[in-house]
Protein backbone atom coordinates (compact mmCIF):
# COMPACT_ATOMS: atom_id res chain seq x y z
CA UNK A 1 0.00 0.00 0.00
CA UNK A 2 1.41 3.33 -1.04
CA UNK A 3 0.20 6.73 0.20
CA UNK A 4 -0.52 9.33 -2.43
CA UNK A 5 2.39 11.52 -1.34
CA UNK A 6 4.89 8.63 -1.86
CA UNK A 7 3.98 7.92 -5.47
CA UNK A 8 6.64 8.85 -8.01
CA UNK A 9 5.70 6.72 -10.97
CA UNK A 10 3.03 4.43 -12.18
CA UNK A 11 -0.52 4.83 -13.34
CA UNK A 12 -2.78 6.47 -10.76
CA UNK A 13 -6.53 6.54 -10.51
CA UNK A 14 -8.62 8.32 -7.88
CA UNK A 15 -12.15 7.22 -7.12
CA UNK A 16 -14.12 8.76 -4.21
CA UNK A 17 -11.15 9.13 -1.93
CA UNK A 18 -9.62 5.69 -2.71
CA UNK A 19 -6.14 5.72 -4.18
CA UNK A 20 -5.54 2.73 -6.49
CA UNK A 21 -1.90 2.21 -7.46
CA UNK A 22 -0.83 -0.35 -10.05
CA UNK A 23 2.99 -0.72 -10.25
CA UNK A 24 4.23 -1.02 -13.84
CA UNK A 25 6.82 -3.69 -12.89
CA UNK A 26 7.44 -5.57 -9.71
CA UNK A 27 10.49 -4.50 -7.76
CA UNK A 28 12.33 -5.77 -4.78
CA UNK A 29 11.29 -2.67 -2.85
CA UNK A 30 7.54 -3.13 -3.35
CA UNK A 31 5.53 -6.35 -3.30
CA UNK A 32 3.75 -7.33 -6.47
CA UNK A 33 0.13 -6.49 -5.60
CA UNK A 34 -2.68 -4.05 -6.29
CA UNK A 35 -3.13 -1.79 -3.29
CA UNK A 36 -6.48 -0.29 -2.26
CA UNK A 37 -5.73 2.60 0.06
CA UNK A 38 -8.67 4.13 1.89
CA UNK A 39 -7.94 7.66 2.79
CA UNK A 40 -9.28 7.24 6.28
CA UNK A 41 -8.90 10.84 7.33
CA UNK A 42 -10.63 12.12 4.21
CA UNK A 43 -13.47 9.65 4.62
CA UNK A 44 -13.96 10.72 8.20
CA UNK A 45 -14.11 14.37 7.13
CA UNK A 46 -16.66 13.56 4.44
CA UNK A 47 -18.75 11.62 6.94
CA UNK A 48 -18.71 14.55 9.36
CA UNK A 49 -19.80 16.89 6.58
CA UNK A 50 -22.60 14.50 5.57
CA UNK A 51 -23.83 14.25 9.15
CA UNK A 52 -23.77 18.02 9.46
CA UNK A 53 -25.66 18.40 6.20
CA UNK A 54 -28.29 15.89 7.30
CA UNK A 55 -28.74 17.76 10.58
CA UNK A 56 -29.12 21.05 8.74
CA UNK A 57 -31.67 19.55 6.34
CA UNK A 58 -33.67 18.19 9.27
CA UNK A 59 -33.55 21.59 10.97
CA UNK A 60 -34.73 23.35 7.82
CA UNK A 61 -37.51 20.79 7.37
CA UNK A 62 -38.73 21.36 10.93
CA UNK A 63 -38.55 25.12 10.49
CA UNK A 64 -40.47 24.87 7.22
CA UNK A 65 -43.18 22.84 8.95
CA UNK A 66 -43.37 25.46 11.71
CA UNK A 67 -43.61 28.30 9.21
CA UNK A 68 -46.35 26.49 7.31
CA UNK A 69 -48.25 25.98 10.55
CA UNK A 70 -48.12 29.68 11.44
CA UNK A 71 -48.87 30.76 7.88
CA UNK A 72 -51.97 28.55 7.81
CA UNK A 73 -53.07 29.92 11.17
CA UNK A 74 -52.49 33.50 9.98
CA UNK A 75 -54.50 32.76 6.85
CA UNK A 76 -57.39 31.47 8.97
CA UNK A 77 -57.24 34.54 11.23
CA UNK A 78 -57.23 36.91 8.27
CA UNK A 79 -60.23 35.13 6.76
CA UNK A 80 -62.03 35.47 10.08
CA UNK A 81 -61.10 39.17 10.24
CA UNK A 82 -62.44 39.64 6.71
CA UNK A 83 -65.77 38.09 7.71
CA UNK A 84 -65.93 40.28 10.81
CA UNK A 85 -65.18 43.39 8.77
CA UNK A 86 -67.95 42.48 6.36
CA UNK A 87 -70.29 42.60 9.35
CA UNK A 88 -69.34 46.26 9.80
CA UNK A 89 -70.65 47.04 6.33
CA UNK A 90 -74.38 47.63 5.84
CA UNK A 91 -76.27 44.52 4.81
CA UNK A 92 -79.10 46.56 3.32
CA UNK A 93 -79.18 50.16 2.15
CA UNK A 94 -82.04 52.47 3.12
CA UNK A 95 -84.46 53.67 0.47
CA UNK A 96 -86.13 56.85 1.66
CA UNK A 97 -88.44 58.80 -0.58
CA UNK A 98 -86.70 59.39 -3.92
CA UNK A 99 -83.26 58.44 -2.55
CA UNK A 100 -81.57 55.21 -3.61
CA UNK A 101 -78.09 54.11 -2.56
CA UNK A 102 -75.65 51.79 -4.34
CA UNK A 103 -72.18 50.54 -3.38
CA UNK A 104 -69.06 48.90 -4.81
CA UNK A 105 -66.47 47.46 -2.42
CA UNK A 106 -63.21 45.82 -3.58
CA UNK A 107 -60.60 45.27 -0.84
CA UNK A 108 -56.99 44.85 -1.94
CA UNK A 109 -56.52 41.93 0.47
CA UNK A 110 -58.39 39.91 3.04
CA UNK A 111 -59.18 43.03 5.06
CA UNK A 112 -59.55 46.61 3.94
CA UNK A 113 -58.63 50.09 5.11
CA UNK A 114 -61.86 51.37 3.53
CA UNK A 115 -65.14 51.60 5.39
CA UNK A 116 -68.52 53.06 4.51
CA UNK A 117 -72.03 53.15 5.87
CA UNK A 118 -75.47 54.48 4.91
CA UNK A 119 -78.10 54.73 7.65
CA UNK A 120 -81.30 56.44 8.75
CA UNK A 121 -80.75 59.40 11.05
CA UNK A 122 -84.45 60.06 11.57
CA UNK A 123 -87.64 59.96 9.55
CA UNK A 124 -86.40 62.58 7.08
CA UNK A 125 -82.61 62.32 7.04
CA UNK A 126 -80.23 59.69 5.73
CA UNK A 127 -76.61 59.76 6.87
CA UNK A 128 -73.62 58.46 4.93
CA UNK A 129 -69.89 58.35 5.44
CA UNK A 130 -66.79 56.88 3.90
CA UNK A 131 -63.40 56.53 5.60
CA UNK A 132 -60.02 55.46 4.27
CA UNK A 133 -57.31 54.56 6.80
CA UNK A 134 -53.68 55.00 5.84
CA UNK A 135 -52.02 51.81 4.67
CA UNK A 136 -53.51 48.37 4.13
CA UNK A 137 -54.11 45.15 5.96
CA UNK A 138 -54.95 44.55 9.60
CA UNK A 139 -53.74 47.88 11.12
CA UNK A 140 -55.80 49.88 8.63
CA UNK A 141 -58.82 47.63 9.13
CA UNK A 142 -58.64 48.02 12.91
CA UNK A 143 -58.49 51.80 12.52
CA UNK A 144 -61.64 51.82 10.39
CA UNK A 145 -63.43 49.74 13.03
CA UNK A 146 -62.45 52.32 15.63
CA UNK A 147 -63.77 55.07 13.37
CA UNK A 148 -67.11 53.32 12.98
CA UNK A 149 -67.55 53.04 16.75
CA UNK A 150 -66.26 56.55 17.48
CA UNK A 151 -68.31 58.51 14.92
CA UNK A 152 -71.21 60.27 16.65
CA UNK A 153 -73.94 61.66 14.39
CA UNK A 154 -76.53 62.90 16.89
CA UNK A 155 -76.63 64.30 20.39
CA UNK A 156 -79.36 62.82 22.56
CA UNK A 157 -80.73 64.50 25.67
CA UNK A 158 -83.83 64.32 27.86
CA UNK A 159 -85.48 66.91 25.64
CA UNK A 160 -84.86 64.97 22.45
CA UNK A 161 -82.01 64.79 19.96
CA UNK A 162 -80.00 67.07 17.73
CA UNK A 163 -78.37 65.98 14.48
CA UNK A 164 -74.74 67.01 14.55
CA UNK A 165 -73.50 69.12 11.68
CA UNK A 166 -71.15 67.04 9.49
CA UNK A 167 -68.19 69.29 10.35
CA UNK A 168 -68.88 68.94 14.07
CA UNK A 169 -69.15 65.16 13.78
CA UNK A 170 -65.78 64.95 12.02
CA UNK A 171 -64.17 67.31 14.55
CA UNK A 172 -65.29 65.11 17.43
CA UNK A 173 -64.05 62.01 15.61
CA UNK A 174 -60.69 63.67 14.96
CA UNK A 175 -60.20 64.54 18.63
CA UNK A 176 -60.97 60.96 19.65
CA UNK A 177 -58.33 59.68 17.23
CA UNK A 178 -55.75 62.18 18.47
CA UNK A 179 -56.47 61.25 22.10
CA UNK A 180 -55.51 57.63 21.40
CA UNK A 181 -51.82 58.62 21.34
CA UNK A 182 -51.04 55.72 19.07
CA UNK A 183 -47.33 55.12 18.53
CA UNK A 184 -47.63 54.34 14.84
CA UNK A 185 -48.69 56.85 12.21
CA UNK A 186 -52.43 56.29 12.20
CA UNK A 187 -54.59 58.72 10.33
CA UNK A 188 -57.46 58.57 7.91
CA UNK A 189 -59.48 60.52 5.41
CA UNK A 190 -63.26 60.69 5.54
CA UNK A 191 -66.43 62.23 4.18
CA UNK A 192 -69.56 62.49 6.29
CA UNK A 193 -72.87 63.92 5.18
CA UNK A 194 -76.63 63.74 5.37
CA UNK A 195 -79.46 64.17 2.89
CA UNK A 196 -82.93 65.40 3.73
CA UNK A 197 -85.17 63.06 1.78
CA UNK A 198 -87.97 65.66 1.72
CA UNK A 199 -86.07 68.79 0.69
CA UNK A 200 -83.13 66.98 -1.03
CA UNK A 201 -80.66 69.28 0.71
CA UNK A 202 -77.30 67.52 1.11
CA UNK A 203 -74.95 68.69 3.87
CA UNK A 204 -71.43 67.33 4.03
CA UNK A 205 -67.91 67.83 5.39
CA UNK A 206 -64.61 66.40 4.24
CA UNK A 207 -61.42 65.37 6.09
CA UNK A 208 -58.64 65.16 3.52
CA UNK A 209 -60.77 62.85 1.38
CA UNK A 210 -61.22 62.97 -2.42
CA UNK A 211 -63.93 65.44 -3.37
CA UNK A 212 -67.39 63.92 -3.80
CA UNK A 213 -68.44 63.95 -7.44
CA UNK A 214 -71.94 65.16 -8.36
CA UNK A 215 -73.29 64.21 -11.76
CA UNK A 216 -76.34 66.35 -12.44
CA UNK A 217 -79.30 65.03 -14.32
CA UNK A 218 -78.67 67.72 -16.94
CA UNK A 219 -75.18 66.33 -17.69
CA UNK A 220 -73.00 68.75 -15.72
CA UNK A 221 -70.36 67.37 -13.33
CA UNK A 222 -69.24 69.09 -10.11
CA UNK A 223 -66.53 68.43 -7.55
CA UNK A 224 -68.03 69.21 -4.13
CA UNK A 225 -65.22 70.99 -2.33
CA UNK A 226 -64.83 71.70 1.37
CA UNK A 227 -61.85 72.31 3.65
CA UNK A 228 -60.63 69.91 6.30
CA UNK A 229 -57.41 68.09 7.16
CA UNK A 230 -56.70 64.44 7.82
CA UNK A 231 -58.23 62.75 10.83
CA UNK A 232 -55.94 61.92 13.74
CA UNK A 233 -53.17 64.47 13.11
CA UNK A 234 -53.95 67.75 14.88
CA UNK A 235 -56.30 68.27 17.84
CA UNK A 236 -59.13 70.79 17.64
CA UNK A 237 -59.07 70.79 13.85
CA UNK A 238 -61.95 72.46 12.01
CA UNK A 239 -63.94 70.88 9.19
CA UNK A 240 -65.98 73.06 6.89
CA UNK A 241 -69.69 72.40 6.48
CA UNK A 242 -71.09 72.72 2.99
CA UNK A 243 -74.50 72.08 1.51
CA UNK A 244 -75.93 71.66 -1.96
CA UNK A 245 -79.41 71.26 -3.36
CA UNK A 246 -79.94 67.95 -5.10
CA UNK A 247 -82.44 67.52 -7.91
CA UNK A 248 -84.20 64.68 -9.67
CA UNK A 249 -81.80 62.63 -11.79
CA UNK A 250 -78.69 63.60 -9.79
CA UNK A 251 -76.06 61.05 -8.80
CA UNK A 252 -73.63 61.75 -5.95
CA UNK A 253 -70.47 59.61 -5.96
CA UNK A 254 -68.43 59.26 -2.76
CA UNK A 255 -65.30 57.17 -3.21
CA UNK A 256 -61.82 56.41 -1.91
CA UNK A 257 -58.62 57.27 -3.75
CA UNK A 258 -58.25 53.64 -4.84
CA UNK A 259 -60.64 54.44 -7.69
CA UNK A 260 -58.32 57.21 -8.89
CA UNK A 261 -55.33 54.86 -8.79
CA UNK A 262 -57.25 52.13 -10.60
CA UNK A 263 -58.29 54.42 -13.44
CA UNK A 264 -55.21 56.64 -13.48
CA UNK A 265 -54.00 57.60 -16.93
CA UNK A 266 -50.54 59.02 -17.59
CA UNK A 267 -50.92 61.29 -14.57
CA UNK A 268 -51.17 59.35 -11.33
CA UNK A 269 -54.10 60.26 -9.09
CA UNK A 270 -55.68 62.29 -11.89
CA UNK A 271 -59.46 62.13 -11.55
CA UNK A 272 -60.03 62.97 -15.21
CA UNK A 273 -60.05 59.34 -16.38
CA UNK A 274 -62.36 58.37 -13.55
CA UNK A 275 -64.81 61.09 -14.61
CA UNK A 276 -64.58 59.97 -18.22
CA UNK A 277 -65.50 56.43 -17.20
CA UNK A 278 -68.62 57.75 -15.49
CA UNK A 279 -69.61 60.15 -18.25
CA UNK A 280 -69.47 57.35 -20.82
CA UNK A 281 -72.10 55.54 -18.77
CA UNK A 282 -74.34 58.47 -18.00
CA UNK A 283 -77.47 56.85 -19.44
CA UNK A 284 -76.97 53.51 -17.70
CA UNK A 285 -78.68 52.52 -14.46
CA UNK A 286 -76.34 52.98 -11.51
CA UNK A 287 -76.24 49.24 -10.83
CA UNK A 288 -74.98 48.66 -14.38
CA UNK A 289 -72.40 51.44 -14.08
CA UNK A 290 -70.84 49.89 -10.99
CA UNK A 291 -70.93 46.41 -12.52
CA UNK A 292 -69.08 47.56 -15.65
CA UNK A 293 -66.51 49.46 -13.60
CA UNK A 294 -65.83 46.30 -11.60
CA UNK A 295 -65.58 44.19 -14.76
CA UNK A 296 -63.15 46.67 -16.31
CA UNK A 297 -60.96 46.46 -13.23
CA UNK A 298 -60.96 42.65 -13.48
CA UNK A 299 -59.56 42.92 -17.00
CA UNK A 300 -56.77 45.29 -16.00
CA UNK A 301 -53.20 44.02 -15.72
CA UNK A 302 -52.43 43.29 -12.08
CA UNK A 303 -56.07 43.01 -11.09
CA UNK A 304 -55.24 39.96 -8.95
CA UNK A 305 -52.93 42.14 -6.85
CA UNK A 306 -54.56 45.59 -6.71
CA UNK A 307 -52.52 48.46 -5.34
CA UNK A 308 -55.24 49.84 -3.09
CA UNK A 309 -58.66 49.19 -1.64
CA UNK A 310 -61.52 50.57 -3.71
CA UNK A 311 -64.94 51.71 -2.48
CA UNK A 312 -67.78 53.69 -4.02
CA UNK A 313 -71.09 54.84 -2.55
CA UNK A 314 -73.64 56.38 -4.90
CA UNK A 315 -76.60 58.43 -3.69
CA UNK A 316 -79.14 58.61 -6.50
CA UNK A 317 -82.18 60.86 -6.71
CA UNK A 318 -84.66 59.01 -8.84
CA UNK A 319 -85.62 60.90 -12.00
CA UNK A 320 -89.31 60.69 -11.18
CA UNK A 321 -88.84 62.44 -7.82
Features from the language model and the residues they span:
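Non-catalytic regulatory/interaction regions at protein termini and inter-domain linkers
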Residues: 1-30, 91, 249, 287-307, ...
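Short linear motifs in intrinsically disordered/low-complexity regions
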Residues: 7-9, 16, 30, 52, ...
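PAS-family sensory domains
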Residues: 15-20, 129-131, 255
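Amphipathic alpha-helical coiled-coil "transmission" helices that mediate dimerization
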Residues: 26-76
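Interdomain signal-transducing alpha-helices
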Residues: 40, 44-47, 143, 147, ...
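Residue-level detector of alpha-helix boundaries and kinks
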Residues: 52, 69-70, 158, 278, ...
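… and, occasionally, acidic/histidine-rich disordered N-termini of signaling adaptors
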Residues: 56-251, 302-321
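C-terminal catalytic subdomain
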Residues: 245-254, 259-321
Amino acid sequence: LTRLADIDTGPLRLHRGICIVTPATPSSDAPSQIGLVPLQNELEKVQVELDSLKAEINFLRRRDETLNFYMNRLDEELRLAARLQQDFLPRTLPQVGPLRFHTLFRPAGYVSGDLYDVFRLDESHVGFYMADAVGHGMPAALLTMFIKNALVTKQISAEGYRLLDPGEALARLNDKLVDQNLTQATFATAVYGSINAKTLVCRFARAGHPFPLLMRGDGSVLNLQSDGGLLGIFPNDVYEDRQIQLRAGDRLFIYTDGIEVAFADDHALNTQQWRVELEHRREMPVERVLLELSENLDRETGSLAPKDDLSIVVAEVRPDA
